[in-house]
Each structure stands twice: as C-alpha cells, then as structure tokens.
Amino acid sequence: MVSIIYYSMTGNTKKMAMAMAEELGVKALNVKDAASLPNDGILLIGSGCYGDKPGEPMAKFIANNDFGGRKVALFGTSGAGAGNEVAAMAEALKQKGAEVIGNYHSAGRAFVVANIGHPNKDELSAARKFAREMASIG
C-alpha cells in the first residue's frame, strides 16, 4: 500500500499529488490533515519550494514523526528553484530514519506569472509514472 502526503500553497504540488493518487487508486492527504504517520508501506511525500525548503507544515510533519525504516519517495514543485525542497526533505527524512527510494521534481507556477501552466500534461504523466515505479518497489 502507498500513502501520499503533500503540502501545497499554490496548488501545483496538490495537482501532482492528485494525479499520482488517481494513478495508484489511493487518496492524497494534505499534510495539514495528517494527524499522524500512516501505517501503510511506502510513503510518497511532496511539497512546493519556499525559500529552497519545503513548506513549514511539511517540515514540521517530518520533524515530528519517526520514519525509522520506512521507504519514502519524494516529489516537489518549484517556480524558481531546482528541486532544493526535495533535497532538504531527503536530508531531514534520512535523519529521521527513512530510506529515501526516489524523487521527482517539476516546475510550478511562481510569482503568479512564471511557469504558468505547470505542472503540465507531460510533467503530470511523468509524475504518474514515478508513482507507479515507487509503488512497485514496496
């Protein structure tokens, strides 16, 4: 089983999470609604990029949970960065005991104008493929 948890301020990461959830036949859960770490096997965790870091709600979720031995795949969107939020999440999760098994990053709309239309159809298709590949590892 796979659980998808995301944080999205502008809707870009939510769009990606929903595409992956649809592909896998599971629900995507906003981190603000995640009271605790799901007991399911693989976790797909995603966030937008805010100052080269994941959003504060996601950073707190990672800090407040024990990921010991859990397989985690990461995804993210950013308008101006190059996936730095994914790297920051990977480092934090490894420190919390997670096994990071993969990551996917896509452009997202930033500052209202930059990257309008992202994640686009091709990026969402790639995200779906990524989700299938990560689910098959578990």
Role assignments for model-derived ranges:
Residues 2-3, 8-33, 37-138:
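FMN-binding flavodoxin-like domain, especially the glycine-rich phosphate-binding loop
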